Amino acid sequence: MLKELSRLFSLSLALIFVFSCVPKRVEIPVYEGIDVRDVLSAKNNISAIDTTFSIVFEKNDSEMRGEGVLNISRNGDLSLRVYSFGFLALAVTSEKGMIKSNPRIDRNKGKLLTQGLRDCLFWWDIQNFDVDEKDGTYLLKNFSREIWLDKKTILPIKQRVSLDDGRELHISYEDMEKMGDVWYPSKIRIELSQYSVTLRIREILFTGAV
């Protein structure tokens, strides 16, 4: 009898330890009843983003996988390094719209890795937009961008960006995570013509975050 009680007591302690070690799920805050413009403007203090991620480039039936390190400013200036099997496979910089890369990349890939990264990460930075509500979403729209947001969480679902040449960037978002006080999508896919890029964010830092 004593052995049985001792065994049950030990099992109870083990279960308490296990469940105490399980991370608590943090619920995404709900912004129902709050103006979407106020929620977005609260993020305007964010001036730069540093992030590391896994990255998959796809073109037609081919793909390349790697690990990315990115520093990007709200104005679009960026420094991107992509490593494959531990070796530097691609380096891209953009400053005041001047793009440099090693090795050279074509126009489509350049758009994906500059304007695509800027608009997908700084998704809330949209000016002079109209708001429509439909089926539990907000649609934010101006002359060059359309962003669909979840109406409760004010987090992005997808985005469409019109380029100067008439083509469009298509961006989709999944798997919301939290860093500090900022919620962000940890999986992002950007598509342009026959190209696509999928990011799985590992670490992220928001400079000037709320």
Residues covered by each model-derived region:
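Sec-dependent bacterial lipoprotein signal peptides
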Residues: 1-21
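N-terminal leader/targeting segments and the immediate start of mature chains
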Residues: 20-69, 76-77
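Beta-strand elements of well-folded, non-transmembrane domains
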Residues: 55-59, 72-76, 84-86, 175-177, ...
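Membrane-embedded segments
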Residues: 64, 81, 85-89, 106
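Extended lipid/amphipathic-ligand handling interfaces
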Residues: 68-72, 92-97, 172-178, 203-204
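Flexible beta-edge/linker motif
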Residues: 87-93, 101
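Acidic/charged, solvent-exposed loop-and-adjacent secondary-structure segments enriched in E/D, K/R, S/T
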Residues: 98-130
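Gly/Pro-enriched, hydrophobic low-complexity segments
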Residues: 133-210
